[in-house]
Each structure stands twice: as structure tokens, then as C-alpha cells.
Amino acid sequence: MTNLLFTPTVQKIKADIGDLDVTPIVEKVVITMYKDYPYLEEKFGDKGKERTIEDNFYHFLYLNTAYKLKDTQTFLEYALWLNSILVSRGMKTDLIIYNFEKIKENMSGMLDKEIEESFLSYLDGGIQALKEYKQNSGIE
């Protein structure tokens, strides 16, 4: 049983993802993020945690879309778009990179092997794209 709050947005994303059950992965990632970065709760409160949960389901929606399309670029464009949105709201690119790294760590053995390998590749690409963005834009 999960402790995650399933907002209507999360319920819709889960329906869009389909048969792929990523809830246990999202739960581990969100718990780890809030443990490693306690300031998130202080700065963004319960609404911020809801958004973090939603964002992590969105990450999987775009990973799954890229997988179905066999198109890495789909996830790379999502990662860069997400970065522009979250940075404008006070987040740091490093936290998005960290989030993607935690997804990689926590999905090990949780998905079909072919899907997991594809998702790992897309996440690696997203992490690299964000690091290059940071370097090219001179962000610390």
C-alpha cells in the first residue's frame, strides 16, 4: 500500500501510462528526495510534495512515450522543457538531475528488462542534456 496522495492529475497520468505500474518507484524516489532535501518541505509545503509526486509520474509518462515511439529525443525535449519550467519556479537544474538519478537507482529490477534498459538510456540522455545545458548557460 502506498502513502502517496493520488490527486486527480496523478490519477489521469497513471491512466495515460497504462499497465506500467510505477507507483512503488515514484514512492521510493519522493521519500528519498524529501529525506535528502528536507528544505523542500519547508520551502514548498504539501502543495510542493503533491507537485513532486505528479512530476515523477510525468517523468514516467514521457519515458513510456519515448519507449513506445522508440525515440530518445522525446524524453530529451521533455527534460529540457521541464527544466525551463521548474527553474522559473525556483528549482535548480541539479535537483532535476538528482531526481532522474534517483529514478534510475530505484527502478532497478522493478520493470520489464527491455523497458528498464530503454528507460535507463533515456534518463542518461536527459541527465547529459541537462548537464550540457548547465555548462553552456554558465549555471553554477
Predicted regions and their residues:
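Core of compact, soluble alpha-helical bundle domains
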Residues: 1-81, 87-91, 96-101, 108-140
